[in-house]
C-alpha cells in the first residue's frame, strides 16, 4: 500500500512542508498551533480541489432521490423478472443522466488521500511530543478518545445533512432508512479507525467534515429552502 501511494505521499509531504514553512515564517503561532493551522489550510486546499466533484455528486444524489419513486414502481412491476427490472432501471438512469455509482466517487478519491496523509504524518517525526490543547502528542493517537468521538460524530452529521435535504427535495423518497444505516456504519468505522490514527490525521478528517457541512449548507440546504419557499408562494397564488 505504501509503495502504491508513494507519489501521492511525496506530493502531500511537499505541500504540507511548504504550508508549514509559510505559517512558521509568520512567527505569531506556537509550535502546536502552527501545525494545526497548517493541517487546516491543507484540508481547505484539498476540499477546494474536490469541490467541483462534490457539486457533481450532490446533483447526482438529488436526481437519484427524485427518481426513487419510479425505481420503486419498476421493482414492483418486474419483481419476478430481476433482469428486466435492471434493464429498465439502467434505461431510467440514462434518460435522467444519473450515474448510480457517482455517490461513491468522492469517497473513493478521499480514501487514498487519507491513507497517503497517514504516511505523511507518521513520517514527520518532528511532530513527536508537539502538543495542542488536550492533545499531548500530535504524532500519536488521542488516548482521551475526544478526537475519535469527534471523527465519528462529524462523519455522521456531514452525511446526515446531505441525505436529509436530498431526500426532502424528493418528497421523502424510499431508501432513507438504508442511507441512515450506511451513515451510521461509516461513522462507526471512522471512529474506530481514528482510535489508532495519529491525532494530526484525525484532525484533518474532522476539519474536512466541518468544511463539508459548510459546503453542503450552501450547495444543498440554502437552494432547498429557496425552492420550498417558492413552492409555498406558488400554492398561495393558486
From Swiss-Prot:
Record keywords, A-Z: Cell membrane, Chaperone, Membrane, Protein transport, Transmembrane, Transmembrane helix, Transport
Membrane topology term: Multi-pass membrane protein
Main location class: membrane
Entry GO MF terms: membrane insertase activity
Ranges that cross the membrane: 4-24, 26-46, 104-124, 145-165, 175-195, 201-221
Locations listed in the record: Cell membrane
InterPro entries in UniProt: YidC/ALB3/OXA1/COX18, YidC/Oxa/ALB_C, YidC_ALB_C
GO biological process, one term: protein insertion into membrane
Protein origin, superkingdom: Bacteria
GO CC field: plasma membrane
Entries under CDD domains matching the protein: 5TM_YidC_Alb3 (cd20070)
Role played: Required for the insertion and/or proper folding and/or complex formation of integral membrane proteins into the membrane. Involved in integration of membrane proteins that insert both dependently and independently of the Sec translocase complex, as well as at least some lipoproteins. Aids folding of multispanning membrane proteins.
Subunit structure: Interacts with the Sec translocase complex via SecD. Specifically interacts with transmembrane segments of nascent integral membrane proteins during membrane integration.
Family: Belongs to the OXA1/ALB3/YidC family. Type 1 subfamily.
PANTHER family xrefs: CYTOCHROME C OXIDASE ASSEMBLY PROTEIN COX18, MITOCHONDRIAL, OXA1
Name listed for the protein in its UniProt record: Membrane protein insertase YidC
Organism: Clostridium perfringens (strain 13 / Type A)
